[in-house]
Amino acid sequence: MLALQVLPAPAEAAPALVAPGAPMRVFPQDPPKTIDLPTGQKLTMPRDGWVGTCSQGPNGTLHLPGKEPQRVMLTASHCVNTMPGFPEVKNEFYAPVGTEYKRFGERVASNHVTAEAMNLSDPMQSIRTADWGVVRIDDGVTETGLSHSRDFNGGVQGEPVKITRVRDFRTLAPGEVSVDNFGQPICKDGATTGRTCAKQIGRTRNGIYSWGLNYVQGDSGGVNYDPRDGAAVGVSSMTLGPLGKAQPVDRIIEDAYGIPDGKVNEAFTPTDSTAPRENFTTSGEEEERVSAEIERLNSNLKPPAPREELRKAVDNAKQEAAGLAQKASQGQFDPAEVNRAINHHSDRIGYWGGASLGEEIAKRL
């Protein structure tokens, strides 16, 4: 009699943590424990209250001469680097699942984006700047090439779309503008507004411009693709109203690795995997959980009374104005001190004036 050997069933692959359009998170190196409130009180903050929110771009494998293949995910620079005015971030990137954050990779390349370019205070810098980052995917992390997303409240639009290749445009010279993509369709998946589709209206060396994709905070870095063939076109970068700018995917590969124009698809291959995605936490669920934790940590904190704080702010401004007037009468006029006082008290009065108005409006709704 032949003995039959029973083989163990193959282990199922873990759900994909790396997925185009999925949420991406980053934490500060040393998150502050408290925040100073305008009332002078301190608000205790949990670590998760400092999480940086972005979305994942296209993922695949790099094939570079003389090097081992490397799995990477492409996204926006401002999603993987410390932004001005914010705590320094770790070089570790996570996806939210349940109440946890699961690590999936680390930054291996990116360009520098100035504060003036990101906050649109220098429009020409905003137009010209590149905005790209490359995240190496950790060993053992499952990825999928299916682009999809859920919006802030968990809403879903459309079906998963396979990312097939990179749209390798002719590389434009600095300052050159082209409309060879005018009217071509473009869709994006992002972790805040989900999937939206629109039309391309033009491009520059480091920008694919569209009208109506409506990026908002948290969508940054997410994949932009051509719905006709699944080609990755860009990653969400910045917006001015309905005008959106995506960082071209082909320029990421060219800039980061010196790949010649027209050779991008030889150097980067989107993953063939169609593994099911992890059940990512929506941004709304995450915000609700973090807000509840902040309330728990500050249960003894007395909420401010806007009208009372406004009265205090006005009284303080009057007192300092009287003191400065007395000093001026004694020949001790200091323009810098006066400007500092004006700016400080204007900010305080404006803040509490707005809060008081908001409180009154809320009472009438």
Give the predicted meaning of each segment.
Residues 225-339:
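C-terminal subregion of chymotrypsin/trypsin-like serine protease catalytic domains
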Residues 52-54, 156-179, 184-187, 191-278:
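Active-site region of chymotrypsin-like
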Residues 351-365:
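Short, low-complexity, Pro/Ser/Thr/Gly-rich segments in the mature regions of secreted, periplasmic
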